[in-house]
Amino acid sequence: MSKNKLNLVLPPVNTEATVAAATVAPTPPFKTPSGTDTHSLLGKPKTSIDALTETLEGLDMGDTERKRIKMFLSQKEKIGELSDEDLEKLGELGSGNGGVVMKVRHTHTHLIMARKLIHLEVKPAIKKQILRELKVLHECNFPHIVGFYGAFYSDGEISICMEYMDGGSLDLILKRAGRIPESILGRITLAVLKGLSYLRDNHAIIHRDVKPSNILVNSSGEIKICDFGVSGQLIDSMANSFVGTRSYMSPERLQGTHYSVQSDIWSLGLSLVEMAIGMYPIPPPNTATLESIFADNAEESGQPTDEPRAMAIFELLDYIVNEPPPKLEHKIFSTEFKDFVDICLKKQPDERADLKTLLSHPWIRKAELEEVDISGWVCKTMDLPPSTPKRNTSPN
């Protein structure tokens, strides 16, 4: 593969994700109500939804979480085959990675969904392969993974229909909040680590695209990850649309070398620094900028005025590969949080902490024990009707 003068390459085809999708036990074929095969992925499967429900019993989750997933699967069973005609557009939720995400209503059940539309000009065989690979998502049922209703192809677009998270993505929340409190970030990180561990241990899936816009929250306080790489063919077909994603990629991915789930750890660490200080941390902000972020009036003033100059994309990627990684240096952050970020952002993947180490880190242990009202914080930040009493939602 040829490299540019900065010794960087575009992200390679994801052979690992393709292999992972191929090695996972296939979901039983989905059928239309009449029993004929369809390119939609949400007809009722030959095996009942009970088969998926049974798999929940062996997973590490609480009774409330298990009950919520069972309710989701029950709703999913009632929907039947998905098609464009059955989805009423309610508004746009966001865009990125070559697609737009719409809020839609399923007209027969009145269920609200998030529909991601990805425009693809591909041959029929490629289209079928993408739909086939996306079937793996039916198997991904976990408290910290966004639920999947199905996918279909219509008018040159792949539609992926997912669970609607009314709090939105963390990049949108970050714009509203200015920065995200450490106590909130602790719970978010715990959820992301559990989600990544589930994908790896149960489905041999590497996420490949961890960043704030792919971490979603809702007014019930749930935290879920989305947009992970189950379809190697879809990733390959969209290879030129991942400009924003590259800024969160690990040095080894940017250099085109072998990568693993350790690459997701780098992306998580970089995302944490961004959410903690309220701005993308490469190049790092100077002392004056940091002081303006954490000044007493920072919550009212929004983003600091003296931000680092914007870098061209290849200049930015060269910085990620060749310069020291970002750090959390302000005194407002705990020592444990700073250490957690540091072990996520080691330049060499074999020196970077793994998922097991991170899940047992003192900062995560503290987050598990600390009472933090994610629901109240989300509702307060995004002006949503409160669903639980608010407690411990202060910014520090």
From Swiss-Prot:
The UniProt entry, under InterPro entries, shows:
Kinase-like_dom_sf, MAP_kinase_kinase, Prot_kinase_dom, Protein_kinase_ATP_BS, Ser/Thr_kinase_AS
Look up the domain of life of the source.
Eukaryota
Please write the reaction equations for the catalytic activity of this protein.
L-seryl-[protein] + ATP = O-phospho-L-seryl-[protein] + ADP + H(+); L-threonyl-[protein] + ATP = O-phospho-L-threonyl-[protein] + ADP + H(+); L-tyrosyl-[protein] + ATP = O-phospho-L-tyrosyl-[protein] + ADP + H(+)
The residues that hold ATP are 93-101, 116
Q: Write down which residues bear the modification named Phosphoserine.
A: 237, 241
Instruction: Give the function comment from the record.
Output: Required downstream of Raf in the sevenless (sev), torso (tor), and Drosophila EGF receptor homolog (DER) signal transduction pathways. Involved in both positive regulation (at the posterior terminus) and negative regulation (at the anterior domain) of tll, as in other terminal class gene products, maybe via the ERK-A kinase.
Give the record's keywords alphabetically. ATP-binding, Developmental protein, Kinase, Nucleotide-binding, Phosphoprotein, Serine/threonine-protein kinase, Transferase, Tyrosine-protein kinase
The reported effect of residue 394 to L is: In strain: Reids2
Q: How would you summarize the oligomeric state and partners of this protein?
A: Interacts with Raf and ksr; Dsor1 binding to ksr probably promotes ksr and Raf dimerization and ksr-mediated Raf transactivation.
Residue numbers annotated as active site: 209
Kindly give the Pfam families that the UniProt entry links to this protein.
Pkinase
**What family name appears in the similarity comment?**
Belongs to the protein kinase superfamily. STE Ser/Thr protein kinase family. MAP kinase kinase subfamily.
Listed under GO cellular component are: condensed chromosome; cytosol
Q: Does the keyword rRNA-binding apply?
A: no
What name has this protein been given in UniProt? Dual specificity mitogen-activated protein kinase kinase dSOR1
Report the PTM annotation.
Answer: Phosphorylation on Ser/Thr by MAP kinase kinase kinases regulates positively the kinase activity.
Q: Where is the Protein kinase domain?
A: 87-364
Q: MF terms per GO, please?
A: ATP binding; kinase binding; MAP kinase kinase activity; protein serine kinase activity; protein serine/threonine kinase activity; protein tyrosine kinase activity
Q: What is its EC number?
A: 2.7.12.2
PROSITE patterns the record matches: PROTEIN_KINASE_ATP, PROTEIN_KINASE_DOM, PROTEIN_KINASE_ST
